């Protein structure tokens, strides 16, 4: 870091697992990241891998708890099959798991049977039914493609399309809020999606042209997802 002179390591990609050099750089690890509340968002596994490394090396860890921006009352979606573990799925949690990052740390400690010295600094003023915009906290994008709270709400339902040949909206101004492809008929998809009667959500036909990622530079057709009622949305 140019201001402090502190060495900065990247705990992602090839170094998502802490190296010995990284572990030798500290005695206590402070974890302070804003998660989005979805099982396949990578910060959950950055947390877990850090905990495993500290457990192995005998290091202490402090987690600064942060609210779950999409609320702490609802859970939903499928539970991970352990046969498909990866960096975007390593714990048997539902898609929307309803925990704060501090609660997730305690869950991971118990799930992985870790014995590390873990301290969670608790939240203040948050109630489980609160979404981020029920607080006075600003939305600070936890990653470039999760730019709004609505994107986080849509993400729990649309991120699955990353594993298909459909665009999940990366390379547009509405990542995870739009899905589509050059070969999709937006009007037909709109009718079929709304015909499912899914609670709390409406689908509107749209077209978009990703500037990067899947179908870069190609006009795609599909739907935009509008969450109308968070309480019934599932």
Kindly give the residue locations of the regions a language model identified:
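A short helix->loop->beta-strand "cap" motif at the edges of active sites that frequently abuts
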Residues: 54-60
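Glycine/threonine-rich flexible loop motifs
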Residues: 35-47
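Conserved functional hotspot residues or short segments at active or partner-binding sites
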Residues: 180-234
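Glycine-rich oxoanion-binding loops at beta->alpha junctions
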Residues: 2-25, 38
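ATP/pyrophosphate-binding catalytic subdomain of soluble kinases
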Residues: 132-203
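Conserved anion/nucleotide-ligand pocket segment
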Residues: 84-156
